Amino acid sequence: MENYQKIEKIGEGTYGVVYKARDLTHPNRIVALKKIRLEAEDEGVPSTAIREISLLKEMHDPNIVRLLNIVHADGHKLYLVFEFLDLDLKKYMEALPVSEGGRGKALPDGSTLDMNRLGLGEAMVKKFMAQLVEGIRYCHSHRVLHRDLKPQNLLIDREGNLKLADFGLARAFGVPLRTYTHEVVTLWYRAPEILLGGRQYSTGVDMWSVGAIFAEMCTRKPLFPGDSEIDEIFKIFKLLGTPDENTWPGVTSFPDFKASFPKWKREDTRKLVPGLERNGLDLLDAMLEYDPARRISAKQACMHPYFQAGSSAYSGRERLQPYP
């Protein structure tokens, strides 16, 4: 660790403390040091985790936060060295003026972002969404899932570009129920197949999270703010309707699905996200598709009409045929 000089603690992530630090081998380079707190610290760092993390160093995409180095210190401490970005999407949304649905909070000290110029209007939401799905497409094409996407791990640089952080960490270290400070890890962006106890899941879990984040960027409010797993499931069912074998073949076989669940009817997406253009509503529906086999992929999302110039009519639920 002699190559890094800690400047200040900047946060407490899912896996441990995050520090802003100076890279002493590169003049003027500021980095984020993520100290990974391992469950069994006395046993050292699992070799599987080291292997997984080493693969992430090979991932280079403008929409992903670069993993610059891995430092294995004292036998049982692991530090991940990332490029430094001082703002995440959650703080960005909170810094929006109250008149725009934000909370008017101050940006972190030292942030040079011009919120008045950037804001979070339709064009900015579309830009962030394009960068988000492109970053996910890149990761999925390298067989890397995120599994814990949320506004807190979408970082924004000083030019107002969005980058994904913490990709691949879930596979290396698991997704804990609580952070090391005993904070509950948020369920608001978790896909229904995980909430219902599914053991086999794929890239679709990330696309569900993107849908929930998309809606939140538009409305400035979380779409499914559950405070427990069952509350989260019911929040989803109340808005999207309780799924059955017709809407989601196989749903009744999930370990945590109960035939006694209340039967809610689906709300109109236009009411959930008022003001979103028709192509945006179409994309949101495709991301919040219950059946993971029919949920839009990141590659397909990149080519969605929402990201093209012009707009076409929103055709509602009947548009959602299985994606090829």
From Swiss-Prot:
GO MF annotations, alphabetized: ATP binding; cyclin binding; cyclin-dependent protein serine/threonine kinase activity; protein serine kinase activity
Positions bearing Phosphothreonine: 14, 181
Gene Ontology cellular component list: cyclin-dependent protein kinase holoenzyme complex; cytoplasm; nucleus
One Pfam match: Pkinase
Protein residues bound to ATP: 10-18, 34
Enzyme Commission number: 2.7.11.22
Activity regulation note: Phosphorylation at Thr-14 or Tyr-15 inactivates the enzyme, while phosphorylation at Thr-181 activates it.
Signal sequence region: none
Quaternary structure annotation from Swiss-Prot or TrEMBL: Forms a stable but non-covalent complex with a regulatory subunit (SUC1) and with a cyclin.
Highest taxon of the lineage: Eukaryota
InterPro entries, per database record: CDK, Kinase-like_dom_sf, Prot_kinase_dom, Protein_kinase_ATP_BS, Ser/Thr_kinase_AS
SUPFAM superfamilies according to UniProt: Protein kinase-like (PK-like)
Taxon lineage: Eukaryota, Fungi, Dikarya, Ascomycota, Pezizomycotina
PROSITE patterns linked: PROTEIN_KINASE_ATP, PROTEIN_KINASE_DOM, PROTEIN_KINASE_ST
Its biological purpose: Cyclin-dependent kinase that acts as a master regulator of the mitotic and meiotic cell cycles.
Modified residues annotated as Phosphotyrosine in this record: 15
Native source organism of the sequence: Ajellomyces capsulatus (Darling's disease fungus)
UniProt-listed GO biological process terms: cell division; G1/S transition of mitotic cell cycle; regulation of G2/M transition of mitotic cell cycle; regulation of gene expression; signal transduction
Protein family: Belongs to the protein kinase superfamily. CMGC Ser/Thr protein kinase family. CDC2/CDKX subfamily.
Active site: 148
Residues of the Protein kinase domain: 4-307
UniProt gene name: CDC2
UniProt protein name: Cyclin-dependent kinase 1
CDD domains the UniProt entry points to: STKc_CDK1_CdkB_like (cd07835)
